UniProtKB/Swiss-Prot annotation:
This is Uncharacterized protein aq_1845. InterPro entries: PatA-like_N (IPR025497), Tscrpt_reg_TrmB_N (IPR002831), WH-like_DNA-bd_sf (IPR036388), WH_DNA-bd_sf (IPR036390). It comes from the Bacteria. PANTHER family: DOMAIN GTPASE-ACTIVATING PROTEIN, PUTATIVE-RELATED-RELATED (PTHR36304), DUF4388 DOMAIN-CONTAINING PROTEIN (PTHR36304:SF4). It holds the Pfam family DUF4388. It comes from Aquifex aeolicus (strain VF5). Disulfide bonds: none annotated.
Length: 230
C-alpha cells in the first residue's frame, strides 16, 4: 500500500484514521521545509518518531529492535520522540507525506505510549474550520454512537468539552442542536465531531427507508374482479 499526499489536503487525523482502521504496519515519512520525520507504525499504532537527514536511511535500518538499540532508546524515550516530533508538528501543514507498508521488521510486542485514538483526537484539535467541514458539511446532520464507542473513547483521553459534545450525540440531535445545547463555539464542536468520527466512536445516522405497503396477490385479484363487475 502506498499512501501519499500533502498535509493541507489530508490531515494527520485522516492519515492515522486510515492506518489505524486497517491495522497497517510500515513507515510514514513526512517532509517539511525544515525537517523530515519518519513515523514508525505498528498495527496502526504510532510507536516511534525520528528525524532523518536522508529518506533512504530509513530503509537501511529495517530491523526495529536493532534501530532502538542503535538510537539508545527505551520505552520512556520512545514516548518522548512522539511528543517532540509528532505532537509539536501538528500545526505545520506545509508537509508532504508517503506511507510505505512493510520494510520495517517489527518484533511482536512494541510499547505504545499514546493510543492511536488519543493521537487522532489531538490532531483533530488542530484542524481549521474549513478542514472540519469536509466531514461536518451540514448542520442538519445527525450522528449516533457506534456500538463499541466506549472502548474507543476510553483510549482517546477526551477533554471535558469533548465529553459534553459526545453526550449530546444520541441519534436525534442535529449538529445545530449540539451547537445550541452545548454552548460551545462552532470550531470546538466541529473539531470534536471530526475526531470522534475519525476514531470510530460515532457515525452518521442513516435515514430509515420507509417501505410502501405491498398488496398481496390475492387481494389484488379480488380488487380486479370487483372492478370488472362495475
Amino acid at each position: 500500500m502506498a499512501l501519499t499526499g500533502d498535509l493541507k489536503s489530508f490531515s494527520f487525523a485522516d492519515i492515522l484514521q486510515v492506518l489505524h482502521h486497517d491495522k497497517k504496519s510500515g513507515v510514514l515519512i513526512v517532509e517539511w521545509p525544515d525537517i523530515t520525520v519518519a513515523y514508525y507504525i505498528k498495527d496502526g499504532e504510532l510507536v516511534l518518531a525520528r528525524p532523518v537527514d536522508k529518506v533512504f536511511r530509513v530503509y537501511v535500518d529495517r530491523d526495529f529492535e536493532k534501530l532502538i538499540e542503535k538510537l539508545r532508546l527505551n520505552e520512556r524515550t520512545m514516548a518522548e520522540t512522539i511528543k517532540k516530533f509528532f505532537l509539536s508538528r501538528l500545526e505545520n501543514k506545509d508537509g508532504i507525506f508517503s506511507f510505505t507498508q512493510g520494510f520495517i521488521n517489527y518484533p511482536e510486542n512494541v510499547p505504545v505510549a499514546f493510543p492511536a485514538e488519543e493521537l487522532i483526537m489531538e490532531a483533530a484539535r488542530h484542524l481549521t474550520l474549513e478542514e472540519t467541514e469536509r466531514k461536518i458539511s451540514d448542520e442538519l446532520l445527525v450522528f449516533e454512537k457506534a456500538p463499541d464507542w466506549e472502548v474507543k473513547v476510553q483510549r482517546a483521553n477526551l477533554k471535558e468539552e469533548e465529553r459534553k459534545v459526545l453526550e449530546l450525540v444520541n441519534g436525534e440531535n442535529t449538529v445545530k442542536d449540539i451547537l445550541e445545547k452545548s454552548g460551545l463555539d462552532k470550531l470546538t464542536v466541529y473539531r470534536t465531531l471530526y475526531g470522534l468520527l475519525a476514531i470510530g466512536a460515532i457515525r452518521r445516522k442513516r435515514k430509515k427507508e420507509i417501505r410502501k405497503p405491498t398488496i398481496s396477490l390475492d387481494l389484488l385479484t379480488k380488487l380486479i374482479e370487483k372492478i370488472k363487475k362495475l
